[in-house]
UniProtKB/Swiss-Prot annotation:
The modification Phosphothreonine is found at T229. Pfam families: Pkinase. The keyword Nucleotide-binding applies. The gene is NIM1K. This is Serine/threonine-protein kinase NIM1. The active site is at D196. GO terms for molecular function: ATP binding; magnesium ion binding; protein serine kinase activity; protein serine/threonine kinase activity. ATP binds at I80, G81, S82, G83, N84, F85, S86, Q87, V88, K103. The lineage of its organism: Eukaryota, Metazoa, Chordata, Craniata, Vertebrata. It is an enzyme of class 2 (transferase). Changing T229A: Loss of autophosphorylation and kinase activity. It comes from Homo sapiens (Human). It comes from the Eukaryota. Residues 23-55 are annotated as: Disordered. Keywords: ATP-binding, Kinase, Magnesium, Metal-binding, Nucleotide-binding, Phosphoprotein, Serine/threonine-protein kinase, Transferase.
Length: 436
């Protein structure tokens, strides 16, 4: 079956960045022997020229490509995770040395349903501009595999932290939860429903900063639009997913936020069972208990979100203005930015950060001519990948992605408060099926 993927949200014939010798020719790169200065003297290759040349002429690099240890401009390291239809590996971008997460999918296993999910995943990530949402840098295709190159969050999953260290303190929970809620608000304002919010899909980039990732089950849904597919992890599933033929997406995401908050402040799940059938019964009954160490304001917020009737659940704004969340700063969305570098070659009036990005690209050897030749390739281009990585780096440096700061209690004091309560549950695997 021929894979078809997103271009502006629709399904079209695939056109992914597949590196071959044409890339260096189209980008204006020549072999080293033909690189001469104005007086006919050999000159040093730019980093971009050197890399593109090595990918076709350097024996070691060619061998890495052949063995699957390199794709495009990325050297592939060890596995750092796995998704519903994929594995995730650490990658190093050869030009910028940026660490990235590379989601690898086997093209032979991409049926029509999986193709639609992948298309939505790419589309969703490219529509969102928020400091607490994982970014997509590039999409690379080889003969047998597809690679989604994304921002790397080196601090691990929220699930892993709580599973090994125990529940978070309430001040820490507020800080982390505020970032997740702000990210979800941004999604919903852009008509995107995540449908798989859980601790396994929240990633630390520092001790106090997290990002929401894995948009593999996301979809676009207008306000009030009814959906009819079950997506996500059963312990986080809202009751209407088990009960009704249709559901409204934002309410499902909000329910998952309630489960997530409960997990953060207690170190365990509100609804637990040995089988999915028993779990379904527990969720439909809506019976759960909140440990006495949880403050009353936090308890009320959890209760307000985990309402059986979707329309009676707290909305995002209500959550953000809740008593328990008072005094917690919410990150704000970034100003929309260009996902393609073409504007750098089309206008002479650039913002400060755009000039810095352009200057860095030129230092690497990526000129306006390369950028003009790159038009129309979207994320499926090594040049676009370099541009997005550098843009993100510049934005981080300018504190557009600020890291929250708060005073946390002494670790020993936290351990005493937690006692021996450490969540030893297994990772929650997301499911996909149609509700009949």
């Amino acid at each position: 079956m021929t894979a078809v993927y997103m271009n502006g949200g629709g399904l079209v014939n695939p056109h992914y960045a597949r590196w071959d010798r044409r890339d260096s020719v189209e980008s204006g790169c020549q072999t080293e022997s033909s690189k001469e200065g104005e007086e006919g003297q050999p000159r040093q290759l730019t980093p971009f020229e050197k890399l593109t040349q090595d990918m076709s002429q350097d024996e070691k690099v060619v061998r890495e490509i052949t063995l699957g240890k390199r794709i495009g401009f990325y050297r592939i390291r060890g596995e750092i995770g796995s998704g519903n239809f994929s594995q995730v590996k650490l990658g190093i971008h050869s030009l910028t040395k940026e660490k990235v997460a590379i989601k690898i999918l086997d093209k032979t296993k991409l049926d029509q349903k999986t193709q639609r999910l992948l298309s939505r995943e790419i589309s969703s990530m490219e529509k969102l501009h928020h400091p607490n949402i994982i970014r997509l840098y590039e999409v690379v295709e080889t003969l047998s595999k597809l690679h989604l190159v994304m921002e790397y969050a080196g601090g691990g999953e929220l699930f892993g932290k709580i599973s090994t260290e125990g529940k978070l303190s309430e001040p820490e929970s507020k800080l982390i939860f505020s970032q997740i809620v702000s990210a979800v608000k941004h999604m919903h304002e852009n008509q995107i429903i995540h449908r798989d919010l859980k601790a396994e899909n929240v990633f630390y980039t520092s001790n106090t900063c997290v990002k929401v990732g894995d948009f593999g089950f996301s979809t676009v849904s207008k306000k009030g639009e009814m959906l009819n597919t079950f997506c996500g992890s059963p312990p986080y599933a809202a009751p209407e997913l088990f009960r009704d033929e249709h559901y409204i997406g934002i309410y499902v995401d909000i329910w998952a936020l309630g489960v997530l908050l409960y997990f953060m402040v207690t170190g365990t799940m509100p609804f637990r069972a040995e089988t999915v059938a028993k779990l379904k019964k527990s969720i439909l009954e809506g019976t759960y208990s909140v440990p006495p160490h949880v403050s009353e304001p936090c308890h009320r917020l959890i209760r307000g979100v985990l309402q059986q009737i979707p329309t009676e659940r707290y909305g995002i704004d209500c959550i953000m203005n809740d008593e328990w969340m008072q005094g917690v700063p919410y990150p704000t969305p970034l100003e929309p930015f260009q996902l393609d570098p073409k504007h750098l070659s089309e206008t002479s009036t650039l913002k400060e950060e755009e000039n810095e990005v352009k200057s860095t690209l030129e230092h690497l050897g990526i000129t306006e001519e390369h950028i003009r030749n790159n038009q129309g390739r979207d994320a499926r281009s090594s040049i676009t990948g370099v541009y997005r990585i550098i843009l993100h780096r510049v934005q981080r440096k300018k504190a557009l992605e600020s890291v929250p700061v708060m005073m946390l209690p002494d670790p020993k004091e936290r351990d005493l408060k937690k006692g021996s309560r450490v969540y030893r549950g297994i990772r929650h695997t997301s499911k996909f099926c149609s509700i009949l």
